[in-house]
């Protein structure tokens, strides 16, 4: 029989990335968390956490994390379904269930919050959003640190199901002054090699995809690193560099003349999918169905 106090310690370490932060979340000492994880590893006969900065789950650890969080979600659902049993309802039904999801920053900054707000309020559900690049969010559900993910990966992660949400369209944009300074002679291999671009983080490959489409070559321009979606767009508006920005964030700026499209008609489309556990959990299934429906109102 699994000891859920030990499993909770494992989940906390994987979720928070360190034993110290897990200890604060559980209101115990780091030593206690370490002892619980070590005891669990001894009982299952396998290393469950790769110690590092951050700590991450091993394959076995990810399986146990997913199991533990599924049990927690099922208990939350059970508490809401048994109001006629006061003791059980009191034990399980008072806390709002929490859904931990991985979402790319562009989606959070444009459509995701508007899509899910009403559902969260009506169903008394809390969101714990993990920000990651859209090409890497699927890894979060694979390693057991989230229960769902908005991702570019169409193929379902093992034990999950995948549904298409829609498409985000990105365009290469910059300020008019920046365009005149760097691209007066055209957007080509030489000008793209010299002009600074804006990258969200090292995982952001949209700028590289655009460069390869235009030049059919690998070009390494000077780069600003700005891991904040509003700051990213602002850097383009103020002439710091050019970048790939979603239409939903730049349409008004382009209409006002604060941004210009560098190569009209050469947008990049990014298909987004919702991946979540295949295990049927009522409100998690309802969340996925709602997200698919609402995403259609915001995405192409």
Q: Which role does the model predict for each range below?
A:
Residues 93-158:
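Central regulatory/effector-binding core of bacterial HTH transcription factors
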Residues 11-27:
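Short helix-boundary/capping micro-motifs
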Residues 43-44, 64-92, 291:
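Alpha-helical linker/hinge and terminal dimerization helices associated
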Residues 161-240, 254-267, 297-300:
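C-terminal regulatory
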Residues 16, 25, 41-47, 122:
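Residue cluster at the C-terminal edge of the helix-turn-helix DNA-binding motif
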Residues 29, 36-39:
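Residues within the DNA-recognition helix of helix-turn-helix
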Residues 264-300:
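A late-sequence structural motif
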Residues 41-60:
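A short LG(V/I)-centered, amphipathic sequence patch enriched
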